[in-house]
Curated annotation (Swiss-Prot):
Molecular function terms, GO-annotated: glycogen phosphorylase activity; nucleotide binding; pyridoxal phosphate binding
Record's function text: Allosteric enzyme that catalyzes the rate-limiting step in glycogen catabolism, the phosphorolytic cleavage of glycogen to produce glucose-1-phosphate, and plays a central role in maintaining cellular and organismal glucose homeostasis.
Family recorded in the similarity comment: Belongs to the glycogen phosphorylase family.
Modified residues (N6-(pyridoxal phosphate)lysine): 681
Positions of the record's site feature: May be involved in allosteric control: 156
Name of the featured protein: Glycogen phosphorylase, liver form
Subcellular location: Cytoplasm, Cytosol
Known catalytic reactions: [(1->4)-alpha-D-glucosyl](n) + phosphate = [(1->4)-alpha-D-glucosyl](n-1) + alpha-D-glucose 1-phosphate
Modified residues (Phosphoserine): 15, 524, 561, 639
Modified residues (N-acetylalanine): 2
GO biological process: glycogen catabolic process
Modification after translation: Acetylation, which is up-regulated by glucose and insulin and down-regulated by glucagon, inhibits the glycogen phosphorylase activity by promoting PPP1R3B-mediated recruitment of phosphatase PP1 and Ser-15 dephosphorylation. Phosphorylation at Ser-15 converts inactive phosphorylase b into active phosphorylase a. Dephosphorylation of Ser-15 by phosphatase PP1 inactivates the enzyme.
Organism: Ovis aries
Residues that hold AMP according to the record: 43-45, 76, 310
Length: 851
């Protein structure tokens, strides 16, 4: 008789081995059927297209999960250094197609769905965008997660699971109206709630100093409930985790007072605690010092650091060691990247944990903290820098304020010793600003508390070092680095432009997807007329497809053989959508003046959201829609010129418009755009760039040759010289008749006949307080646009320039960026090991990893 199994042997039957599904068309169809009937409880008679989308998403997810579990088991076995990317924004967009591509399932899924008589594209369009970001900063975080997984780094994205993401933009009567983005209303098939890892986060209260140490007591507690989303690498079986925290009230919330009496009200008040993760603040490059926002920033930081320390202890904490010696290994096991200053409170929070809870001496705690953190700066605009009122922090986080004061005191002592007579330097470098309302400068806190600080393009990093944080870089020059941004070629080429991706693969093979520098091989086809024509054909197909989309969704008919001239990004004065608009008015006036003259037809497309409280940005949208109303309905203009405002620009819309673009507008005032990443997406997708020498445009020109971009306007030093001399907008207005005409038309109500003074504030701003000097670059911009039109009339020369740009875009892969972060900042090595899906290690992995 067989010996009975021990409990341990019985447990071994609970295993992922043997249940990881086969990945072929028949199995995918089976999975689809199973999920439609057993997960969604529908049959084909009552299933809606949304049910079919969910059935497909769950089927694809099944193939993710095996890899996800194996990846976490692998990390537990190998115990690699882990990197934690802390960001208040992750602008992920849609997940289905990206997952199919990264798992190598797209063809099989396409075939399975086709065999089931369904339309794959229709199903993909049902998915909601995960719009948990405003623009570039959040989308960068998403691209970085893709690259970290593709490079086999043990990486975790940590953020907030906002119930409402970036608002949906509606245009009514030419004005922006915001609507709530209830992206979770149908459920989210990709996330997994992890209530077993729920953690407490404390607010308010008071600080008590005793002989045993310092305690933060009488606090209000909010619980942080984690939701995990898998992040697959490209064809390497690595699946990392993005963990987003949702706020929950504890069960005894407002009921702790025995005589509270009003039980119903106490339950209703739970909403107040849960509001922390309710909505994303819709500000891009603008600081709004609201208590709820500060709560969000501390909430993500406090929950994340508890999680990081729990995982560190589960993997490496040897109980025979004292906490002090055990934590010596912390920076060897943990790197934390702060995506802008939003998670800056992680620095005092880690100090609080080390000093108050783990009882480390201050100097040891500070040494470990500095070695752990690194900070990425994303903007040089003064209005975007976070400066929290001391009073607000004192009320919400009293212990953290004490720690910040202590950090500042030691920091200033060090500076005073180095520069004994320089009192003004102390003022400039302090973490606390004393003028007016006392404030904490969060960028200064990040710099002092990190071992590395980086800008996001060469020119931006130079400005950071020589202007914005000059004193700090003089003190510690080696702390400051550059890491030029990048984009993931999986989403921004394979997914959004399969025609171009295949064409490239036919010429140079498929390896470029993981090593984008191989695109330089395309230079050997510059003389290949057939290839140039094929590239042009792909662009034409994309334009046709986008024209049909515009007609269907926006009821706008456009000429698909016109030049598609596109500016899509957040609406902000520094991005100068106004300059673009003035050019449209100028083109319109030229056509009206001489209708018989040859004119290269253009469709100008402008899209982007304005922060709800940003009056000038909203007025700019109204101007664009008003100009469009006149231009598009003038029979004399016909199909020569059209202006479209692209409503509700978001990741999934970017995936449609970018591959269809001929001309990419990157026209910020030199020295204002830190990097930009839209510029890179357009370049990779075969658009030519008209732009200033700003942000990553500078490096794009370096890579492709300045003669292969349409560069115009003031350089950084010209802007500085003009500031010194004094910018007089009137001088340009008087000297340039076409500019004068355009401004007069806007001012006198030509584009707003029912309300002639509608744009007076805008015109007034352009004349008297335009920090971004639109008029100063107008003439150069219009002349440069004439060069663009000329080249467009010579398709072969245009296509050669397009190919040169695609071939030069390899530097701008986020894989390259992440390799540089890993090497220079995190001290980590990418791994090209493909994790085996069959084996399984001994237990304990999930205990340590909490996935």
């Amino acid at each position: 008789m067989a010996k009975p199994l021990t409990d341990q042997e019985k447990r071994r039957q609970i295993s992922i081995r043997g249940i990881v599904g086969v990945e072929n068309v028949a199995e995918l169809k089976k999975g689809f059927n199973r999920h439609l009937h057993f997960t969604l409880v529908k049959d084909r008679n009552v299933a809606t297209p949304r049910d079919y989308f969910f059935a497909l998403a769950h089927t694809v997810r099944d193939h993710l999960v095996g890899r996800w579990i194996r990846t976490q088991q692998y990390y537990y076995e190998k115990c690699p250094k882990r990197v934690y990317y802390l960001s208040l924004e992750f602008y992920m967009g849609r997940t289905l197609q990206n997952t199919m591509i990264n798992l190598g399932l797209q063809n099989a899924c396409d075939e399975a769905i086709y065999q089931l008589g369904l339309d794959m594209e229709e199903l993909e369009e049902i998915e909601e965008d995960a719009g948990l970001g405003n623009g570039g900063l959040g989308r960068l975080a998403a691209c970085f997660l893709d690259s970290m997984a593709t490079l086999g780094l043990a990486a975790y994205g940590y953020g907030i699971r906002y119930e409402y993401g970036i608002f949906n933009q509606k245009i009514r009567d030419g004005w922006q109206i915001e609507e709530a983005d209830d992206w979770l209303r149908h459920g989210n098939p990709w996330e997994k709630a992890r209530p077993e890892f729920m953690l407490p986060v404390h607010f308010y209260g008071r600080v008590e100093h005793t002989e045993a140490g310092t305690k933060w007591i009488d606090t209000q507690v909010v619980l942080a409930l984690p939701y995990d989303t898998p992040v697959p690498g490209y064809l390497n079986n690595t699946v990392n985790t993005m963990r987003l925290w949702s706020a929950r009230a504890p069960n005894d919330f407002n009921l702790r007072d025995f005589n509270v009496g009003d039980y119903i009200q106490a339950v209703l008040d739970r909403n107040l605690a849960e509001n922390i993760s309710r909505v994303l603040y819709p500000n891009d490059n603008f600081f709004e010092g609201k208590e709820l926002r500060l709560k969000q920033e501390y909430f993500v930081v406090a929950a994340t650091l508890q999680d990081v320390i729990r995982r560190f202890k589960a993997s490496k904490f040897d109980s025979s060691n004292s906490a002090e010696t055990a934590f010596d290994a912390f920076p060897d096991q943990v790197a934390i990247q702060l995506n802008d200053t939003h998670p800056a409170l992680a620095i005092p929070e880690l100090m609080r944990i080390f000093v108050d809870i783990e009882k480390l001496p201050w100097s040891k705690a500070w040494e470990i903290t500095q070695k752990t953190f690194a900070y990425t700066n994303h903007t040089v605009l003064p209005e975007a820098l976070e400066r929290w009122p001391v009073e607000l922090v004192e009320n919400l986080l009293p212990r953290h304020l004490q720690i910040i004061y202590e950090i500042n005191q030691k920091h200033l002592d060090k500076i005073a010793a180095l520069f004994p007579k320089d009192v003004d330097r102390l003022r400039r470098m302090s973490l606390i600003e004393e003028e007016g309302v006392k404030r904490i400068n969060m960028a200064h806190l990040c710099i002092v508390g990190s071992h590395a600080v980086n800008g996001v393009a060469k020119i931006h990093s130079d400005i950071v070092k020589t202007q914005v944080f000059k004193d700090f870089s003089e003190l510690e020059p080696d702390k400051f680095q550059n890491k030029t941004n990048g984009i993931t070629p999986r989403r921004w080429l394979l997914l959004c432009n399969p025609g171009l991706a295949e064409l490239i693969a036919e010429k140079i093979g498929e390896d470029y997807v993981k090593d984008l520098s191989q695109l330089t091989k395309l230079n050997s086809f510059l003389g290949d007329d057939i290839f140039l024509r094929e590239i042009s054909n792909v662009k034409q197909e994309n334009k046709l497809k986008f024209s049909q989309f515009l007609e269907k969704e926006y009821k706008v008919k456009i000429n698909p053989s016109s030049m598609f001239d596109v500016q899509v990004k957040r609406i902000h004065e520094y991005k100068r959508q106004l300059l673009n608009c003035l050019h449209v008015v100028t083109m319109y006036n030229r056509i009206k003046k001489d209708p018989k003259k040859l004119f290269v037809p253009r469709t100008v497309i402008i899209g982007g959201k304005a922060a709800p409280g940003y009056y000038m940005a909203k007025l700019i949208i109204k101007l664009i829609t008003s100009v469009a109303e006149v231009v598009n309905n003038d029979p004399m203009v016909g199909s020569k010129l059209k202006l479209i405002f692209l409503e509700n620009y978001r990741v999934s819309l970017a995936e449609k418009v970018i591959p269809a673009t001929d001309l990419s507008e990157q026209i910020s005032t030199a020295g204002t755009e830190a990097s930009g990443t839209g510029n890179m997406k357009f370049m990779q997708n075969g658009a030519l760039t008209i732009g200033t020498m700003d942000g990553a445009n500078v490096e794009m020109a370096e890579e492709a040759g300045e003669e292969n971009l349409f560069i115009f306007g003031m350089r950084v030093e010209d802007v500085a010289a003009l500031d010194k001399k004094g910018y007089e907008a009137k001088e340009y207005y008087e000297a340039l008749p076409e500019l004068k005409l355009a401004i007069d038309q806007i001012d006198k109500g030509f584009f707003s006949p029912k309300q002639p003074d509608l744009f007076k504030d805008l015109v007034n701003m352009l004349f008297y307080h335009d920090r971004f000097k639109v008029f100063a670059d107008y003439e150069a911009y219009v002349k440069c646009q004439e060069k663009v039109s000329q080249l467009y009339m010579n398709p072969k020369a245009w296509n050669i320039m397009v190919l040169k740009n695609i071939a030069a875009s390899g530097k701008f892969s986020s894989d390259r960026t992440i390799k540089e972060y890993a090497r220079d900042i995190w001290n980590m090595e990418p791994s090209d090991i493909k994790i085996s899906l069959s084996g399984e290690p001994s237990g304990g992995a999930n205990k340590a990893n909490g996935k």
